[in-house]
């Protein structure tokens, strides 16, 4: 079953956007990942094969930065600390860097699965379907 998302519908409606944006911002603030210098895509689980493939496709510097952010956040968590407010991830820095790559990987996998499940039937030719007069007795 495909998960239902209302995001596109909400983004198209100025009223709903205006209504829900403060709630969204409050949720992001309460989740606290920006206080550790993380981006939203840093929170994605890596145990998934698709995510692993997407991570391998990231540019080297983006991958390095991701690992650095995660390790720094883990260290801060162990020490029960957060970053100084000046070092928190700013909203404009919190963009999706992994999701587009992951969407591409998933689309490729689904296409491959559909292609692998494809059944090719060889059409019968007219020559084989009717018997030739030479063979008729």
Curated annotation (Swiss-Prot):
The keyword Chloroplast does not apply. GO terms for biological process: mitochondrial electron transport, ubiquinol to cytochrome c; proton transmembrane transport. Gene3D superfamilies: Cytochrome b-c1 complex subunit 7. It is a peripheral membrane protein. It is found in: Mitochondrion inner membrane. Keywords: Electron transport, Membrane, Mitochondrion, Mitochondrion inner membrane, Respiratory chain, Transport. Its main location: mitochondrion. Component of the ubiquinol-cytochrome c oxidoreductase (cytochrome b-c1 complex, complex III, CIII), a multisubunit enzyme composed of 3 respiratory subunits cytochrome b, cytochrome c1 and Rieske protein, 2 core protein subunits, and additional low-molecular weight protein subunits. The complex exists as an obligatory dimer and forms supercomplexes (SCs) in the inner mitochondrial membrane with cytochrome c oxidase (complex IV, CIV). Component of the ubiquinol-cytochrome c oxidoreductase, a multisubunit transmembrane complex that is part of the mitochondrial electron transport chain which drives oxidative phosphorylation. This is Cytochrome b-c1 complex subunit 7. It comes from Schizosaccharomyces pombe (strain 972 / ATCC 24843) (Fission yeast).
